[in-house]
Amino acid sequence: MCIRDSSKDLCMIEHIPELVDAGIDSFKIEGRMKTALYVATVARTYRKAIDDYLKDPVLYEKNMPWYLDQISNCTYRQFTTGFFYGKPDSEAQIYDSNTYVKEYTYLGIVGGSNAEGLYRIEQRNKFSVGETIEIMKPNGDNIKAKVLRIVNEEGGEQESAPHPKQVLYIDLGVPMEQYDILRRKEDA
């Protein structure tokens, strides 16, 4: 049996008004060993929540389900508000079995394109031709697309991308930009 004794992840997305009213104008993502997918998802979601709140507090409240969904969809443990509202109680710790949740798998990050119109990625987890994946944009809506082609650095076609950190060129049939994140939703 795996027993954990660790803190829950800090999540203040529902408390943006209090943070802004307190004069906080900079946020830091805590934790070592967070993936680029986690950092990109959290940074994009907080940026949108703050912008929405400053534009119109009603818009911020209206979009709360979207913010919570985005934060919950990246790799996370349970959430806490930490020390913001006083000393945390025992509920801020995880004492039982592993509650680690992973709804999306980080597949890679786009690093540009080549003369053929294929997009260069540094792959992180396996994916295959024919699979539907999601492109997470730094700004804007996510896009679902099918992997049409995978080409290695030597120009050889591949049916799958099984080697972490391998540099590949892919075609998803839709335009991508540098720093787009590729991810796959996992079955529950």
Label each residue range with its predicted role.
Residues 4-188:
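Surface-exposed amphipathic alpha-helical tracts and adjacent flexible/coil segments at the periphery
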